């Protein structure tokens, strides 16, 4: 039996809506990473982007376990000497709650050129509404 390899013309993408309300950050991010990579499909091919578009709503209502709300810090660097910037989880939640889910999912993708293309299929919104109604997205029930 030959190994199946998906072709670009055979890719069928769906739009899915995920509600992040009262979901644990890491557990939700793993499921989203699986969806945007396409690993939930039987036609999964590691070298092809066969995943679905994922719209995450209610990012401001995500929760973290333990004491991460007080201890978690996000780092970025300006590439200048002494340019390390730190942002606490609480500050990030108040200013840009959508970035919390974005960074969690991005950290679960492989570090290669394909992942930079895959992460563009993730759309995160802090509130209940999103501008992708014309794609008629399906509601995805989060496991767990």
Swiss-Prot record:
Belongs to the universal ribosomal protein uL13 family. GO terms for cellular component: cytosolic large ribosomal subunit. This is Large ribosomal subunit protein uL13. CDD domains: Ribosomal_L13 (cd00392). This protein is one of the early assembly proteins of the 50S ribosomal subunit, although it is not seen to bind rRNA by itself. It is important during the early stages of 50S assembly. The keyword Ribosomal protein applies. HAMAP family: Ribosomal_uL13 (MF_01366). SUPFAM superfamilies: Ribosomal protein L13. GO terms for biological process: negative regulation of translation; translation. Keywords: Ribonucleoprotein, Ribosomal protein. It comes from the Bacteria. Part of the 50S ribosomal subunit. InterPro entries: Ribosomal_uL13 (IPR005822), Ribosomal_uL13_bac-type (IPR005823), Ribosomal_uL13_CS (IPR023563), Ribosomal_uL13_sf (IPR036899). One of its GO terms (molecular function) is structural constituent of ribosome. PROSITE patterns: RIBOSOMAL_L13.
């Amino acid at each position: 039996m030959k190994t199946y390899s998906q072709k670009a013309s055979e890719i069928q993408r769906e739009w899915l809506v995920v509600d992040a309300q009262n979901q644990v950050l890491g557990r939700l991010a793993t499921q989203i990473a699986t969806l945007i990579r396409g690993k939930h499909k039987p036609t999964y091919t590691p070298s092809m982007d066969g995943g679905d578009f994922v719209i995450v709503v209610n990012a401001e209502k995500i929760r973290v376990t333990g004491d991460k709300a007080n201890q978690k810090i996000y780092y970025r660097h300006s590439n200048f000497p002494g340019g390390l910037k730190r942002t606490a989880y609480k500050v990030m939640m108040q200013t840009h709650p959508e970035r919390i889910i974005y960074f969690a999912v991005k950290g679960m993708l492989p570090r290669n050129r394909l992942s930079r293309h895959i992460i563009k299929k993730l759309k995160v919104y802090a509130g209940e509404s999103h501008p992708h109604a014309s794609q008629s997205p399906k509601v995805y029930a989060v496991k767990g």
